[in-house]
Curated annotation (Swiss-Prot):
GO terms for cellular component: extracellular region; host cell postsynaptic membrane. It comes from Conus purpurascens (Purple cone). Expressed by the venom duct. The cysteine framework is I (CC-C-C). Alpha4/7 pattern. It is found in: Secreted. Keywords: Acetylcholine receptor inhibiting toxin, Hydroxylation, Ion channel impairing toxin, Neurotoxin, Postsynaptic neurotoxin, Secreted, Toxin. This is Alpha-conotoxin PIC. Alpha-conotoxins bind to the nicotinic acetylcholine receptors (nAChR) and inhibit them. This toxin inhibits rodent (alpha-1-beta-1-delta-epsilon (CHRNA1-CHRNB1-CHRND-CHRNE)> alpha-1-beta-1-delta-gamma (CHRNA1-CHRNB1-CHRNG-CHRND)) and human (alpha-3-beta-2/CHRNA3-CHRNB2) nAChRs heterologously expressed in Xenopus oocytes, but has minimal effect on human alpha-7/CHRNA7 nAChRs. Has no effect on the frequency of responses from the giant fiber (GF)-dorsal longitudinal and GF-tergo trochanteral muscle pathways in the D.melanogaster GF circuit. A non-hydroxylated version of this conotoxin has been synthesized. Hydroxylation of Pro-7 seems to increase the inhibition of rodent alpha-1-beta-1-delta-epsilon and alpha-1-beta-1-delta-gamma nAChRs. Coiled coil: none annotated. GO terms for biological process: negative regulation of signaling receptor activity.
Length: 14
């Protein structure tokens, strides 16, 4: 889990 650093992660981005 955590945040994603690329736009494909959608609303789970940093």
């Amino acid at each position: 889990s955590g945040c994603c650093k690329h736009p494909a992660c959608g609303k789970n981005r940093c």
